[in-house]
Amino acid sequence: MNNDLSIYVSKNSGTAVLLLQGNGTDLTCGSEPMAKIVANTTDAAQEKHVPHITKNGNNIDVSVGSVEHPMTPEHFIEWIILVSGDRLEMAKLTPDMKPRAQFHNVTSGTVYAYCNLHSLWKADI
């Protein structure tokens, strides 16, 4: 398994789907086609979306943005995902939480963060 994710979003409903395995058919939400989103790796807006990774031995601490991302009901990080080899681990967030996650026994991989307004962001470990 590589560290790429296939995530599709409905532009009207905001529904996001992580595709683990597909057969080549188009994904839809109701009658609306879903669009595959591509993760951004750089952010001109004061680095508020790119996951910031700190290694502590074989553990990592992830915070979203070198300047902490806001967490309000209108604008927040919905989840952070670690992809490392055959491992996929998710931290689901709510607006009352900090945009942070910890993952254990990690030596390499990619971390993804999804902002409800500004889409998908990633950083390699």
UniProtKB/Swiss-Prot annotation:
GO terms for biological process: cellular response to oxidative stress; removal of superoxide radicals. Its cofactor is Cu(2+). The keyword Aminoacyl-tRNA synthetase does not apply. It comes from the Bacteria. GO terms for molecular function: electron transfer activity; iron ion binding; oxidoreductase activity, acting on superoxide radicals as acceptor; superoxide reductase activity. Pfam families: Desulfoferrodox. Keywords: Detoxification, Electron transport, Iron, Metal-binding, Oxidoreductase, Stress response, Transport. Induction: Up-regulated after exposure to oxygen stress (at both transcript and protein levels). Repressed by PerR. Gene3D superfamilies: SOR catalytic domain (2.60.40.730). InterPro entries: Desulfoferrodoxin_Fe-bd_dom, Desulfoferrodoxin_Fe-bd_dom_sf, Desulfoferrodoxin_SOR. It catalyses: reduced [rubredoxin] + superoxide + 2 H(+) = oxidized [rubredoxin] + H2O2. Binds 1 Fe(2+) ion per subunit. In contrast to some other SORs, does not bind a second iron ion. Fe cation binds at residues 49, 69, 75, 115, 118. The SOR reaction is believed to be advantageous to anaerobic bacteria, in comparison to SOD (superoxide dismutase), because SOR produces no oxygen by reducing superoxide. Catalyzes the reduction of superoxide to hydrogen peroxide, using electrons from NADH and NADH:rubredoxin oxidoreductase (NROR) and rubredoxin (Rd) as electron transport intermediaries between NADH and Dfx. Is a key factor in the superoxide reductase dependent part of a pathway for detoxification of reactive oxygen species (ROS) in C.acetobutylicum, an obligate anaerobic bacterium. Belongs to the desulfoferrodoxin family. This is Desulfoferrodoxin. It comes from Clostridium acetobutylicum (strain ATCC 824 / DSM 792 / JCM 1419 / IAM 19013 / LMG 5710 / NBRC 13948 / NRRL B-527 / VKM B-1787 / 2291 / W). The gene is dfx.
